[in-house]
Amino acid sequence: MKNKLLFKIFLSLSLALSVYSINDKIIEVSNTSLAADVKNFTDLDEATKWGNKLIKQAKYSSDDKIALYEYTKDSSKINGPLRLAGGDINKLDSTTQDKVRRLDSSISKSTTPESVYVYRLLNLDYLTSIVGFTNEDLYKLQQTNNGQYDENLVRKLNNVMNSRIYREDGYSSTQLVSGAAVGGRPIELRLELPKGTKAAYLNSKDLTAYYGQQEVLLPRGTEYAVGSVELSNDKKKIIITAIVFKK
């Protein structure tokens, strides 16, 4: 527990100093796959009970519910402009700005009561934004052996991503249970949310157009530091483990 706390302290300091520098000793600590003191849901019923407490905490207004529901119908209408604007809402049209502010307000109404893992399924295009992992590397990675990914390329991916900080200018849709949503995306981004992280649990029919996906929506501009990149046991999934900076 002491080492994990030390890891989090160094990550927080690194955000202010540099997006690339984290002490080598801390990197070694970060290579654990799942921390024992972080909630990790595998049962849908338990996840739903936990998530419903966040909904109760939020006390959403009717306008909040409409904003969240409309977002889930087509998140690209909000996230697309946000990403093009580099997260600067002043560059958006007034209508989109209003929607963003409403979403910001809605998400801020509930926070995680404890540290918890959430998951985001990604396709390989995600790796095009990773500095140090070339287009040639990506092409080679796509040439799987019966669906199994090359260990050496994943090891290189770990080397270039480990201890680096990444930012999502849009909102981040995640799942409370691994694999709860539609599969087919070979990258699993496993995010640790520290206690007190702003997050909206949307698995309610009046909050999402896709009930059953166990969606947890994170604020726009979410930043996370990568601790490890590794293959699943069957080598068919690339697992990126990271910790989110609490907003």
Swiss-Prot record:
Gene3D superfamilies: Toxin ADP-ribosyltransferase, Chain A, domain 1. GO terms for molecular function: NAD+-protein mono-ADP-ribosyltransferase activity; nucleotidyltransferase activity. Residues 39-247 form the TR mART core domain. It is an enzyme of class 2 (transferase). The lineage of its organism: Bacteria, Bacillati, Bacillota, Bacilli, Bacillales. The keyword NAD applies. Inhibits terminal differentiation of cultured mouse keratinocytes. In culture, also inhibits the differentiation of human keratinocytes. Probable ADP-ribosyltransferase. Keywords: Glycosyltransferase, NAD, Nucleotidyltransferase, Signal, Transferase. This is Epidermal cell differentiation inhibitor. One of its GO terms (cellular component) is extracellular region. Residues 1-35 form the signal peptide. The keyword Ubl conjugation does not apply. The active site is at residues 120, 173, 215. To ADP-ribosyltransferase C3 of Clostridium. Transmembrane segments: none annotated. Its EC number is 2.4.2.-. It comes from Staphylococcus aureus.
